[in-house]
A protein has these predicted regions:
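Membrane-water interface at loop-to-transmembrane-helix junctions
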Residues: 739-761, 780-786
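Long hydrophobic segments that form regular secondary structure
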Residues: 766, 770-780
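Generic alpha-helical transmembrane segments
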Residues: 717, 761-763, 785-799
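Conserved cytosolic headpiece of P-type ATPases
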Residues: 1-738, 746-747, 771, 788, ...
Length: 858
């Protein structure tokens, strides 16, 4: 659509609209704002924690305890309930502020032409048809079509993923092009880095690209897998308890036993079958795990997502600022030879190497390239926050950093002064300066697109000086430029010539007869730790998918360098032509996506999830936020990430280090391993208690354990070792295993078989000791004490043997988990206290044990 057609469609012109029209349109379109969602109050968040099924089961256990008259234990259980709720509340209190962060990105004011006059108004009052003026440093207040432009460049990395400032033009473009290629448009929330323009507002508020992203982020997040599995486990356990309790009640009642005895037995069964410590131990494992992650720069914002991270099968990662440094770096120079430049980012440390040998910056061809790069340049490098930053254009900054690496930047600047400048623009495609240089006179320096710079050159550089530039030379140079571009390098050609102070200063004269100096290739380089992180991920069975707004060639080259994918790249326009079914069919075959929008990222994540993957999505820009929300776990970068992305995420990487993600995955696996161990341990004890009571009653024996005794084991004695299991250190093989099946139940079938086997052994031992003691000693309380202590010690043995589900505990370092050892000691003391402290003997109806009974137990 042409500019005239846009103006006509919006019923506007180059002078904008009138104030009257603006009022009418404001009432029609609404304010230029993003919606503010209703946020739950802190009280509602806290109350919501009590709706968890396992918490409801605990509350039921407390009620049962009150009925049984065990008020102390009931209060203990309620205390656990409140503690679990508080921990969950604290973790989630500040969650989901993404919409608020998005609103903060919108410019508060805008310069607009109304009634033919320039005025400044609140950005919220902008309407379609308004003509706005934008200049360097401005935040774009709404989406708009450019009417007039002067050397305009816009930073769109947070919206599109494009790592470089984008040059904008006032021209007609095809309609079916990617968001990142719409160079005649400016978009809300992006920043003008250079030049100025006049643009007509085409969309405001939720109608903008940023507004559409805001809409994408409204989708409900699925429940974390761990939470779902624990709810399913709680339901199964509650059903089992009710069925067995009912059977025992009916069995005892049918035998003519008093109703109160049958009720007490049923209560004991209900208490036995509920692993009261499980929600607390799960929350504790998650909480301590998040603390360990925080020490490694991975900040978890939602506790259950730790388990999700540990079961990740695919990491979808943005390129710019995540896999790469986000800092343009000069990587290669081509004069009559190829020169490699080492180092990365804006840190001015590195070397210049040709054919394996280090070059000195005094060598003529290299020195000339560096001088031109500094002269034809308006950017600077400065110290910032313990590092370095570029002030100005990142591409120019890369040339400045290269001169700093050579140690000649200050010398070049101090020995020269700017005389004339012909700036870069979209039509010229080059920048030319004339500098007065000490001992050299006046020097013309030019940088720009290779084909453009070559058209102004008549000579080229050789090892022996200069020579006439031939057509064969031109073809060779352009072939070199194409080769560099194929390797994801942003290519600039550099040229120069000396002039005298008597030469004409007209631009045509200045920019003719130049000497071609060489080509420079810059790129946003991969972070040095990323290749190893990806290698470890592969070893752990985790696939890495790169999703970027950058160009196909850049994406392919970065993917090849990092070992991502097989060289195949799908672009956003191809995704637009693919149905959801087609995308799901091909999603496992492609690992690199280029020129994508926020909607594309969400589609990719959803396609992977539809194939059964657990998806982690990393990113730092606004364009990543909807996909982070859609993923099973969203991972934001802490330093370079926008507030929008951080608030949409489940985890924030504080150091922007991709390797930290791998470390977090390892920690997530450790945490889930420990939750599995703790679950197996606690369930084996609960099953053993259930079965011991059931079989004793079924065989006609009195209750072997009282409800108070069971509660003491469940809430106190078994909880200390369980805390130790929750803190078991990571084992060496944890990142050599394939990811868990996301559909695996909690506990899994093999783990349940193992758990039932342990429970059977405990039942046989406990019930056997009880029956033997009861037959030799008519004191029922004494026999129950033997059963209580026996069960307690079986619990201790079980805790220690549960340290690993993969290898024998006897092959492990016996002192490898000191917390568990202290927990076991505390558990033994808690058991002995009930047996030997007089007032506790009264409460729990226990008796001191003889040496014969201790021999039987041990």
């Amino acid at each position: 659509m042409t500019t005239e057609e846009v103006l006509s469609k919006l019923d506007s012109d180059q002078k904008g609209i009138s104030s009257t029209q603006a009022k009418e349109r404001l009432s029609q379109h609404g304010p230029n704002q993003l919606e503010s969602p209703t946020k739950p109050s802190p009280l509602k968040i806290f109350i919501g924690k009590f709706k968890d099924y396992m918490v409801l089961v605990l509350i039921f256990a407390a009620i049962i305890s009150f009925i049984a008259g065990e008020t102390t234990n009931a209060y203990v259980i309620l205390g656990i309930v409140v503690l679990v709720a508080i921990i969950g509340f604290v973790q989630e209190y500040k969650a989901e502020k993404a919409m608020e962060a998005l609103r903060e990105m919108v410019a508060p004011e805008a310069d607009v032409i109304r009634d033919g006059q320039m005025s400044t108004i609140p950005a919220a009052d902008l309407v379609p048809g308004d003509v706005v003026f934008l200049e360097a440093g401005d935040k774009v207040p709404a989406d708009g079509r450019i009417l007039e432009v002067t050397s305009l460049q816009v930073i769109e990395s947070s919206l599109t993923g494009e790592s470089m400032p984008v040059e904008k033009l006032a021209q007609t473009l095809p309609e079916d092009i990617a968001l990142a290629d719409r160079k005649n448009m400016v978009f809300m929330g992006t920043i003008i880095s250079q030049g100025n323009c006049r643009a007509i507002v085409t969309a405001t508020g939720l109608g903008t690209e940023l507004g559409r992203i805001s809409g994408l982020m409204k989708q409900e997040q699925a429940e974390p897998p761990l939470k779902i599995k624990l709810q399913q486990l709680a339901k199964r356990q509650a059903l089992l308890v009710m069925v067995i309790s009912a059977i025992v009640f009916i069995l005892m009642f049918s035998r003519g036993l008093p109703v109160i005895d049958a009720l007490i037995a049923s209560i004991a069964l209900a208490v036995a079958g509920i692993p009261e410590a499980l929600p607390f131990i799960v929350t504790l494992a998650l909480a301590f795990g998040t603390q360990a992650m925080a020490k490694k720069n991975a900040i978890i914002r939602r506790l259950p997502e730790v388990e999700t991270l540990g079961s990740t099968t695919v990491i979808c990662t943005d390129k710019t600022g995540t896999l790469t440094t986000g800092e343009m770096t000069l990587r290669e120079i081509r004069t009559y030879r190829k020169i490699e430049v080492t180092g990365a980012g804006y840190d001015p440390s590195g070397q210049f190497i040709s054919q394996g040998a280090k070059l000195e910056p005094t060598e003529e061809d290299l020195a000339r390239i560096l001088k031109i790069g500094v002269h034809a340049n308006n950017s600077a490098i400065e110290r910032a926050n313990g590092g370095w930053r570029v002030v100005g254009d990142p591409t120019e900054g890369a040339l400045i950093v290269a001169a700093k690496k050579a140690g000649i930047l200050d010398k070049i600047k101090d020995s020269s002064s700017r005389f004339i400048e012909y700036p870069f623009d979209s039509e010229r495609m080059r920048m030319t300066t004339v500098d007065e240089v000490h001992k050299e006179g006046y020097i013309v320096s030019m940088k720009g697109a290779p084909e453009v710079v070559l058209s102004h050159c008549t000579k080229t550089t050789t090892p022996n000086g200069t020579k006439t530039l031939t057509e064969e030379d031109r073809r060779s140079i352009l072939a070199d430029a194409d080769d560099m571009a194929e390797n994801a390098l942003r290519v600039l050609a550099l040229a120069w010539k000396p002039i005298s102070n008597n030469d004409p200063v007209e631009v045509d004269c200045i920019e003719s007869g130049l000497i071609f100096a060489g080509l420079t290739g810059m790129m946003d380089p991969p972070r040095k730790e990323v290749p190893e992180a990806i290698r470890v991920s592969k070893m752990a069975g985790i696939r890495t998918v790169m999703i970027t707004g950058d160009h196909r060639l850049t994406a392919r080259a970065i993917g090849k360098e990092l070992g991502i994918g097989n060289g195949e790249v799908i672009e956003g326009v191809q995704l637009d032509r693919m149905s959801s079914e087609d995308l799901r069919e091909h999603i496992d075959d492609v690992s690199v996506f280029a020129r994508v929008t926020a909607e594309h990222k969400v589609r990719i994540v959803e396609a992977l999830k539809a194939r059964g993957h657990i998806v982690a999505m990393t990113g730092d820009g606004v364009n990543d936020a909807p996909a982070l929300t859609a993923a099973d776990i969203g991972v934001a970068m802490g330093r370079t990430g926008t507030e929008v992305t951080k608030e949409a995420s489940d985890m924030v990487i504080a150091d922007d280090n991709f390797a930290t993600i791998v470390s977090a995955i390892e920690e997530g696996r450790r945490i889930f391993d420990n939750i599995r161990k703790g679950t197996s341990y606690l369930l084996s004890v609960s099953f053993a208690e259930l079965a011991t009571i059931f079989f004793a009653v079924a065989l006609g024996f009195p209750l072997p354990l009282l409800a108070a005794q069971i509660l003491w084991i469940n809430v106190v004695a078994e909880e200390f070792p369980a805390i130790g299991l929750a803190l078991e250190p990571s084992h060496s093989d944890i990142m050599k295993r394939k990811p868990r099946d996301p559909k695996e139940s909690m506990p899994s079938r093999p783990l349940m078989i193992y758990t039932l086997g342990i429970a059977a052994a405990i039942v046989a031992g406990t019930l056997g000791m009880y029956i033997i003691t009861l037959q030799s000693n008519p004191d029922l309380s004494y026999a129950r004490t033997v059963a209580f202590v026996g069960l307690g010690f079986f619990t201790v043995y079980n805790a220690y043997s549960s340290r690993s589900l993969q290898e024998s505990v006897f092959r492990m370092n016996p002192l490898g988990n000191k917390t568990l050892l202290m927990g076991i000691a505390a558990s033994i003391l808690a058991i002995l206290a009930v047996v030997y402290i007089p007032f506790m003997q009264f409460i729990f109806e226990t008796r001191p044990l003889t040496s014969e009974s201790w021999i039987l137990i041990l």
